[in-house]
């Protein structure tokens, strides 16, 4: 994948097409390269999530856990 990026640096206006879902990069000449990315990172990028957004997807479970803990260990929450 180094060669296409060298082309980008050397040629103003040079464009690459990146298909994150298929993990491919295509040059203007039609040459295709594959690249690796972790499933976690891919999921976040495809869904526009950062670590906070990813955590907020589980807000209901987090609230349920907190409430259960508040009931089972109320001394932690006094004050």
UniProtKB/Swiss-Prot annotation:
Gene3D superfamilies: Aconitase, domain 4 (3.20.19.10). GO terms for biological process: L-leucine biosynthetic process. It comes from the Bacteria. Heterodimer of LeuC and LeuD. The keyword Amino-acid biosynthesis applies. InterPro entries: Aconitase/3IPM_dehydase_swvl (IPR015928). It is an enzyme of class 4 (lyase). It catalyses: (2R,3S)-3-isopropylmalate = (2S)-2-isopropylmalate. Its EC number is 4.2.1.33. Belongs to the LeuD family. LeuD type 1 subfamily. This is 3-isopropylmalate dehydratase small subunit. One of its GO terms (molecular function) is 3-isopropylmalate dehydratase activity. Pathway: Amino-acid biosynthesis; L-leucine biosynthesis; L-leucine from 3-methyl-2-oxobutanoate: step 2/4. Catalyzes the isomerization between 2-isopropylmalate and 3-isopropylmalate, via the formation of 2-isopropylmaleate. Keywords: Amino-acid biosynthesis, Branched-chain amino acid biosynthesis, Leucine biosynthesis, Lyase. SUPFAM superfamilies: LeuD/IlvD-like (SSF52016).
């Amino acid at each position: 994948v180094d060669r296409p990026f060298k082309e980008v640096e050397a040629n103003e206006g040079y464009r690459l097409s990146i298909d994150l879902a298929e993990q491919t990069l295509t040059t203007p000449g039609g040459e295709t390269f594959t690249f690796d990315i972790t499933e976690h990172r891919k999921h976040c990028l495809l869904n526009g999530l950062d670590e906070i957004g990813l955590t907020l997807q589980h807000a209901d479970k987090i609230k349920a856990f907190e409430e259960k803990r508040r009931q089972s260990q109320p001394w932690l929450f006094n004050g």
